[in-house]
């Protein structure tokens, strides 16, 4: 949910899905509302400059590490390259709040497949520790996720489709997680992805990727769990058509191996 970039705007043919639709990277917030200022401060925006527009999302998972999608770090010709992250900010750009930290390295998941978006995960290492608390990671066995559990996706993307403008303030929308079999049957994804959404008019959509999909446990932001990162979908806000997210639990072993180095 942020500014549309050439990386995020790329349209990719979806041969595995039996629908006539664009396989597009996400996201945008349809049918949601503003996140209260000063909350969900583990949410991260990727930027090319400290004050520039956010073009991809992520989540702080340790004081010095951000989890995002590998598609956000792809150094393709004409694409935006992240050099900075904005942590804890409510706004699309600027230095009004939060903190701006330099990225010193980016490591994509070893099994990342750019054609299918399997294992679409990347860990960014920061130059210095963030002052904000990181979000909790899910259990490796996937037990934090089950069919129809409510989740929340957040970001700065456009709030109307197809001609909307990016939101200057952090937005969120609540979506339900699909069961694995239903997700695979609908969109042909593997176990490194999960589906959420499918309620008409409420979705993440065309734009940047990497925005966090979280589960709230009713005990405040410190107890939120990172379930996924916004990836791709077919259409926007269509009934019975979910969006696809990178499943964080599928990469836990790899994530831990990177952040503990």
UniProtKB/Swiss-Prot annotation:
Keyword Glycoprotein: yes
Pfam families: Trypsin
Domain Peptidase S1: 29-260
Gene Ontology annotations for the cellular component aspect, listed alphabetically: extracellular region
Cell compartments where the protein resides: Secreted
PROSITE patterns found in the cross-reference section: TRYPSIN_DOM (PS50240)
S-S bonds: 56-72, 183-195, 205-236
Gene3D superfamilies in UniProt: Trypsin-like serine proteases
Record keyword RNA-binding present: no
Family per similarity comment: Belongs to the peptidase S1 family.
Protein name per the record: Glucanase inhibitor protein 3
């Amino acid at each position: 949910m942020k500014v549309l970039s050439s990386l995020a705007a790329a349209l990719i043919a979806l041969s595995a899905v039996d629908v006539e639709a664009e396989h597009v990277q996400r996201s945008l917030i349809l049918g949601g509302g503003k996140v209260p200022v000063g909350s969900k401060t583990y949410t991260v925006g990727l930027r090319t400059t400290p004050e520039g527009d956010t073009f991809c999302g992520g989540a702080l998972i340790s004081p010095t590490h951000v989890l995002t999608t590998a598609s956000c770090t792809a150094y393709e010709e004409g694409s935006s390259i992240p050099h900075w992250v904005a942590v804890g900010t409510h706004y699309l750009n600027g230095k009004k709040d939060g903190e701006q930290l330099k990225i010193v390295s980016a490591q994509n998941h070893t099994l990342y497949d750019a054609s299918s978006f399997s294992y679409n995960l990347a860990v960014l290492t920061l130059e210095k520790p963030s002052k904000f608390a990181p979000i909790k990671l899910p259990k490796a066995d996937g037990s934090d996720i089950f069919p129809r559990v409510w989740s929340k996706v957040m970001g700065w993307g456009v709030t109307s489709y197809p001609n909307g403008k990016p939101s200057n303030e952090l937005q969120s929308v609540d979506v339900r997680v699909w069961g694995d079999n239903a997700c695979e049957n609908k969109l042909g994804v593997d176990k490194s992805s999960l589906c959420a959404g499918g309620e008409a008019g409420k979705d993440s959509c065309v734009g940047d990727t990497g925005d966090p999909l979280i589960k709230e446990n009713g005990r405040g932001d410190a107890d939120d769990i990172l379930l996924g990162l916004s990836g791709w979908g077919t259409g926007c806000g269509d009934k019975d058509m979910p969006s696809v997210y990178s499943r964080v639990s599928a990469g836990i072993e790899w994530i831990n191996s990177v952040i503990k180095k």
